[in-house]
Swiss-Prot record:
Domain C-type lectin: 795-919
Annotated organism of origin: Homo sapiens
Phylogenetic lineage: Eukaryota, Metazoa, Chordata, Craniata, Vertebrata
Residue span(s) of the pro-peptide: 29-83
Residues in Kelch repeats: 352-402, 404-451, 461-508, 513-564, 566-624, 625-671
Protein name, UniProt field: Attractin
Amino acid sequence: MVAAAAATEARLRRRTAATAALAGRSGGPHWDWDVTRAGRPGLGAGLRLPRLLSPPLRPRLLLLLLLLSPPLLLLLLPCEAEAAAAAAAVSGSAAAEAKECDRPCVNGGRCNPGTGQCVCPAGWVGEQCQHCGGRFRLTGSSGFVTDGPGNYKYKTKCTWLIEGQPNRIMRLRFNHFATECSWDHLYVYDGDSIYAPLVAAFSGLIVPERDGNETVPEVVATSGYALLHFFSDAAYNLTGFNITYSFDMCPNNCSGRGECKISNSSDTVECECSENWKGEACDIPHCTDNCGFPHRGICNSSDVRGCSCFSDWQGPGCSVPVPANQSFWTREEYSNLKLPRASHKAVVNGNIMWVVGGYMFNHSDYNMVLAYDLASREWLPLNRSVNNVVVRYGHSLALYKDKIYMYGGKIDSTGNVTNELRVFHIHNESWVLLTPKAKEQYAVVGHSAHIVTLKNGRVVMLVIFGHCPLYGYISNVQEYDLDKNTWSILHTQGALVQGGYGHSSVYDHRTRALYVHGGYKAFSANKYRLADDLYRYDVDTQMWTILKDSRFFRYLHTAVIVSGTMLVFGGNTHNDTSMSHGAKCFSSDFMAYDIACDRWSVLPRPDLHHDVNRFGHSAVLHNSTMYVFGGFNSLLLSDILVFTSEQCDAHRSEAACLAAGPGIRCVWNTGSSQCISWALATDEQEEKLKSECFSKRTLDHDRCDQHTDCYSCTANTNDCHWCNDHCVPRNHSCSEGQISIFRYENCPKDNPMYYCNKKTSCRSCALDQNCQWEPRNQECIALPENICGIGWHLVGNSCLKITTAKENYDNAKLFCRNHNALLASLTTQKKVEFVLKQLRIMQSSQSMSKLTLTPWVGLRKINVSYWCWEDMSPFTNSLLQWMPSEPSDAGFCGILSEPSTRGLKAATCINPLNGSVCERPANHSAKQCRTPCALRTACGDCTSGSSECMWCSNMKQCVDSNAYVASFPFGQCMEWYTMSTCPPENCSGYCTCSHCLEQPGCGWCTDPSNTGKGKCIEGSYKGPVKMPSQAPTGNFYPQPLLNSSMCLEDSRYNWSFIHCPACQCNGHSKCINQSICEKCENLTTGKHCETCISGFYGDPTNGGKCQPCKCNGHASLCNTNTGKCFCTTKGVKGDECQLCEVENRYQGNPLRGTCYYTLLIDYQFTFSLSQEDDRYYTAINFVATPDEQNRDLDMFINASKNFNLNITWAASFSAGTQAGEEMPVVSKTNIKEYKDSFSNEKFDFRNHPNITFFVYVSNFTWPIKIQIAFSQHSNFMDLVQFFVTFFSCFLSLLLVAAVVWKIKQSCWASRRREQLLREMQQMASRPFASVNVALETDEEPPDLIGGSIKTVPKPIALEPCFGNKAAVLSVFVRLPRGLGGIPPPGQSGLAVASALVDISQQMPIVYKEKSGAVRNRKQQPPAQPGTCI
């Protein structure tokens, strides 16, 4: 069904994109065969197969004729050849000019030899006149109604009036009918207009069944007239219909079981039935098998039911024992006109079935409440007071202690969905309207309700799903507490189910669970379809579980519980999207679901010799018997279908007991050796049965991948488990790194990614602060996680945080500011409800049980009597209220003192209190929802801007596109509109007869002038009707009344209802030959004087006037309807050519002159006027101003076609807009190219600095390409200017180079200084030590020198290089000295000498420092390779 769901979006696009071109497309193949072909006019001329032949037989009949025709061909060929030769000789030229239609014309159409096209009679359209497209009047005593051969046309409306004698019974028999279910309808009225009583609304596929157990539908009209109106939309079309009618026909032709004879008591005909058949149409079996006389029963010939069974027998022909060992169907038929209805509800109290509400075609004899005695099988009389409640349908009923609770539903008179809760007291037959204390509820239609007693003793009514016009399809469970008189919306757990409209639900007392099946659901705003889902809702744990689906999609069906089995009957099963696959609107499918085994079974359909297909019916259970009442199958039904299931106690053996069903679940009681029902089984027997079913069950693993959330994946019976982001069967393992979840309890809670996409409307999406509506795709998406941060909560457009710290007002405010927030301003309902809810949760937690939270909020006292919030909005005392005797004068700051009562208190700001509420703006903007469709009361508001809404013109209602079928399930909407297309509100808005008669409720009143002028009025075939001024109120529906005074024939007015008068000149001409307008006057033209002549505009239809086009001299033509001018000058725009295209460089004043394109000097411009929008342009204007005052101005222009050229000049451009101030320069005609030069001396450019040249190009034809350029340049090189420019550039470059060189030098010097500084720092950081030096002098005695220096002098330093293979050896060198051993003045006596020495062959300890020196030496860093330290 994914493809079906996706196709619904395409279906909606096809509907909203319907155009006139689409409406003109013909349908599929037709079967009106014509053997006549071009070139052989004599053979088989006029040979056609009639429409009444079924399509499969027509090709066969044609083939038979062709096989039998060779002898006839041989006889006719010579005659044909002679006739052809004579025709060629006499009128060869005329034959050459005549054209024959490519395909034969049908339905009375004739081929026009001049055009080769079919000319259709009134009411037929199409290339072959094969589609109906107007009104027909049928007066024969019998005949047929058809839409034409082949498929009917898209977006079409056809109307047939069958006229007979007053109060004569007419029968319409639907031999074939196939239209798009729920969208394309054929309406049948018992009268001469749509204001007569509606008796049927046909839609879908209505084909006689091969089994013969269903009869062809038949409609009866008793007024002597019948009006049939057909409407199809733009989605897809089917084969249409073939309907026969007769005024002298017995019901259903006596069903083939009798003879139609004239009644002895009247002139009418009636059936004389064969033996064993009774009823008006001989369709009721009578005394089958002679009722088993004498053993089982006797035949009662006076009773329609026939058999009177003995006490031990029952069923048809008394063939089933008591208790029943097999199930069977029976049918009870009633003719009371107050009974037929659909979408009603029924409950059983004692032996009485109470039926409440429902939809009816006509409300003249409507009864809100009906009572049916199941024992006597008779309808009981009730007080008229039971009808004091407004008529509604699609509501719910629930019975509790002789009281019937009715909730919701759609009010038929207004089309609004209500949230009323009313109670019907059975004992006194009276209604009471309840006013609940808390109204947290949805107004829904198409829902269900059950009253259950919970394990905690509370008695509640549970309302399941439904459709709400404001919030879309509801997936919530609403709970009404009967004792507290309060509503609440439950927060359920388990699977995330999808709510819908028109589902069925039953309550099983044994499992204490609700079982919900099917429905019409929206899976996003643009995707909607029927469903086959089955959900289980545990009423005590509030847990949803997804059970095995039925594979049969349906809605508006019914279900009951019989001995552990849910029986499902009927419903609308149409689920086709782009073409028909045979799914019917009305079904008689009968299915059973075994609760213990989670298994579906298909049961035999009722074999009752009647059409029992239906939807919108009710079903109740009484004494193991199901009673199905009413419903809709194009007609509203009033019969009762009775299904008696087999009884468990009828089986005497264990094998037969366990084999009972399907349709019932029986259990064998070994103790008593009896077969008992599922309801009486013990817990052990139940577990045993479930274990047996578990071992035999077949799992549908393909269903696992349909679950997109962890909750639904783990809360179903398909044995699935969750792997991070997808659902897989249990026998499939998760990928590496993924976490497998098998139990619902282990799923992450409150993940918005799971539940946001279940919301189908913007309003329902906006209720959850974690979701956001995406208007482009019309879907609800989850906001990013932690959009507010940890500990913060998104509420609307704000982030809220509740703290529990005990602080005074200023400290609480400071805490909020530290988080970029303020104390909360609780000014919206969302904020208040969130804070109160969170406070209740926090207060109930164990950690906070001893702490009372009275949090600070952002409310302060500004002056003596004025309080305002932190966001400076005033306090209104509405969402939150002051507690009694508050606010006190002692406090200046607000606290939420009593959250349970929304009570505020003024507190002293310096007192520390528990808690505070902080608020900061969210970093996303919540998108505002548009006005819901249901609140748009005008067509313009409904259809403007988007395709999300649809406007129903006759109901004056706007509905969601995904809820059209749910809003009009019985064809109430006769025509709908979308995407800014709206019809007039009533008939008076149509100005022509043809448009008037397209509307089924309108007629045309022609005035005495007989020129086609008149007015469109609501009316019937007999004349105009006066519509009621009062809207329907309660159960009062005012009816239109015939009022011939609105179009009196005595005053020479003429009323037209079927066809328009022949003369249709819209009041602007008389007619010759009754239909040809003689001469259109009043500035009009056209075949019917329906348009204005060229140069004038207006709506001349029905006497309207034409007025001249107002184009300010820039156009002579305009749109004849709107008056928008077709401006002839390029650059001039506006409806009246009053503006210039400033955005495209055009300037000027078209009100006093024209518009010019501003040209730049020394540029070439090309204008290509080749688009369709350029068709009307014949002129274009340019303006150019010289840039240089000392140079001449050159120009050239060429074009692809001839044109006229005028060049003028003026002292300034502003003067150029005024006539008479431009001086002509050039005037040329019929040229393609022109060049010229304007001397700066001649035109004195120096004294006219604003001189402007105007170029007028005109009188060209579309399309054209124009090139134009103005330029100024010298004929010789200005050397002075060249050298000045050259040297200026050279010096500039030189200066730039010098500056760059200086900058480079500065950077180099700076880097050198930094490098030297680093070297000095590195040298300063080198290791150092002290050394003792003994300097010998000649005067010193040798004995003073220590022994350590007697050896060879040693170096003062040895600095090894990297690798220890080389070193720098440093020694002291004594320099030459003077006398006395003293160096010369200014010189040193010592010097340090260093040399690079090889130490690779030496021991590493050749030079060893003393241990003390080593300890005092600084640690040096490791040297780089090749670096000496």
